């Protein structure tokens, strides 16, 4: 560490602060500290302007910052507290606690800008992470140590799905999770914290009993914080993987806001924008984050990233850049949510590289493909049904349509985290039961069971029990 250098603020434009240093300049990405209204403010060096001046991005509001204020170069990048003591806590982009429970009791810190693991350290494995959510486990299973994208427009259920995954993994697998809230609603962050406390995922009074750490940089934060908070969360997750030998779950809600914040910072720094106004370094920024999320010989990070799709356009540069890094995609479709089927996962658009007979087994693979074939046939028949009606279909097509409608309803299930809203108890469905239920459904074993019996149930036994109830009620 070099001797602390001090400089003076010469210009403040919103979150951008220009600082003049006498002599040697701080390195790009170095953290600068200053005191504003009695509180520490962290800046990150972005550009060397020449004539002894650097341009830095503030990680918090610059209210109260005036010309002539003293700024100190830390000689290092932003460092954040890591370790088990971060579990059950809410931290901000620079690792300061936001939950009014005092400082994080750890002496260990790591820099948020770190190189990705070398090839020699990486490990490849093809193992499924069971989520207990039927549509995901059957049609687009998640790989342990893989990257998953949740794609969807506004209000189709990305955050609810993430909350259910955190809940299921904590309850069934007992692993640690790190949640990075990047530029999303403060209310949702608050709800998530209280729901985690209620479900036992975190204990607000004890890190020993907590299974998740929360790192927040919400919508109201300046762009510098939103552009870096995903890296802070990833650094906390990397500690558990590299030094704790853990299989960690890393949730990002929302990776689009990371790109959006990068575009804002880029514009503030005066860089020429590329397509649709995004930063020219879009691919580089995304790669720097995604390449660090990987499986090593000591542990793994399985990442689930919600991806907001602007105007439901999957060809927008932000979601399109994210696509290339993913092992599985879970696409949420507004048309499915409008039918009242939740989770609103599109069974034909969602993909996974581990849906392979070598990984999931022949029975699972063939059942999944048969389910997709039936749904695809139904989709291609919908125009005929809309114009001519069901009566014009052949007997074989009528059978396919009836099975497809049952499959659509059977792909829905009640969530634990939505119990408060729905009044229906949430369910966790093991993969074996999911595959068995859909296999028998495709074979025509339940052609005489009404389709209403398959809506919002766990497995095939629950569907048959519901059918008996419906029969008795009529």
Swiss-Prot record:
Stored Gene3D superfamilies: 2.40.10.170, Bovine Mitochondrial F1-atpase, Atp Synthase Beta Chain, Chain D, domain 3, P-loop containing nucleotide triphosphate hydrolases
Q: What is its EC number?
A: 7.1.2.2
Topology versus the membrane, per the UniProt entry? Peripheral membrane protein
Query: Which CDD domains does the annotation name?
Result: ATP-synt_F1_beta_C, ATP-synt_F1_beta_N, F1-ATPase_beta_CD
Extract one GO molecular function annotation from the record: ATP binding
Enzyme superclass (EC): translocase
Q: Where does ATP bind?
A: 152-159
Q: What's a GO cellular component annotated to this UniProt protein?
A: proton-transporting ATP synthase complex
Instruction: Report the protein's function.
Output: Produces ATP from ADP in the presence of a proton gradient across the membrane. The catalytic sites are hosted primarily by the beta subunits.
Write out the similarity annotation. Belongs to the ATPase alpha/beta chains family.
Name by which UniProt lists this protein: ATP synthase subunit beta
Q: Which organism is it from?
A: Magnetococcus marinus (strain ATCC BAA-1437 / JCM 17883 / MC-1)
Lineage of producing organism:
Bacteria, Pseudomonadati, Pseudomonadota, Alphaproteobacteria, Magnetococcales
């Amino acid at each position: 560490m070099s001797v602390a250098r001090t400089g003076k603020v010469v210009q403040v434009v919103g979150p951008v602060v220009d600082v003049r240093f006498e002599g040697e300049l701080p390195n790009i990405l170095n953290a600068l500290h200053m005191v504003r209204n009695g509180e520490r403010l962290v800046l990150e060096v972005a550009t060397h302007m020449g004539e002894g001046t650097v341009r830095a991005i503030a990680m918090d509001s610059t209210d109260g910052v005036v010309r002539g204020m003293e700024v100190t170069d830390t000689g290092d990048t932003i460092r954040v507290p890591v370790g088990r003591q971060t579990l059950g806590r809410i931290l901000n982009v620079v690792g300061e606690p936001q939950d009014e429970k005092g400082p994080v009791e750890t002496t260990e810190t790591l820099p948020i800008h770190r190189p990705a693991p070398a090839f020699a350290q990486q490990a490849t494995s093809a193992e499924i992470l069971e989520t207990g959510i039927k549509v995901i486990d059957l049609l687009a299973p998640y790989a342990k140590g893989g990257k998953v994208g949740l794609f969807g427009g506004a209000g189709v259920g990305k955050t609810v799905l993430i909350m259910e995954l955190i809940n299921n993994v904590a309850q069934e697998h007992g692993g640690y999770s790190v949640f990075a809230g990047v530029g999303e609603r403060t209310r949702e962050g608050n709800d998530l914290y209280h729901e985690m406390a209620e479900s036992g995922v975190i204990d607000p009074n004890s890190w020993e009993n907590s299974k998740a750490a929360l790192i927040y940089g919400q919508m109201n934060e300046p762009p510098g914080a939103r552009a870096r908070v995903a890296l802070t969360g990833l650094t906390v997750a990397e500690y558990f993987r590299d030094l704790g030998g853990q299989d960690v779950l890393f949730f990002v809600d929302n990776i689009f806001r990371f790109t959006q914040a990068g575009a804002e910072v880029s514009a503030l720094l005066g860089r020429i924008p590329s397509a649709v106004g995004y930063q020219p370094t879009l691919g580089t920024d995304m790669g720097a984050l995604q390449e660090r999320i990987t499986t090593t010989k000591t542990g793994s990070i399985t990442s689930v990233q919600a991806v907001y799709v602007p105007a439901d356009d999957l060809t927008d540069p932000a979601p399109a850049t994210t696509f290339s890094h993913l092992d599985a995609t879970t696409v949420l479709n507004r048309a499915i949510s409008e039918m009242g089927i939740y989770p609103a996962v599109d069974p034909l658009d969602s993909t996974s590289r581990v849906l392979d007979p070598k990984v999931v087994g022949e029975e699972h693979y063939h059942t999944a493909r048969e389910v997709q074939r039936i749904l695809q046939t139904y989709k291609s028949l919908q125009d005929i049904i809309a114009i001519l009606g069901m009566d014009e279909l052949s007997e074989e097509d009528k059978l396919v349509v009836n099975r497809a409608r049952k499959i659509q309803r059977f792909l829905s299930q009640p969530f634990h985290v939505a119990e408060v809203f729905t009044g229906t108890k949430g369910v966790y469905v093991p993969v074996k039961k999911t595959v068995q239920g859909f296999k028998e459904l495709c074979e025509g074993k339940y052609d005489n069971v009404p389709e209403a019996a398959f809506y919002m149930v766990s497995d095939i036994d629950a569907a048959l029990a519901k059918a008996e109830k419906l029969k008795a009620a009529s």
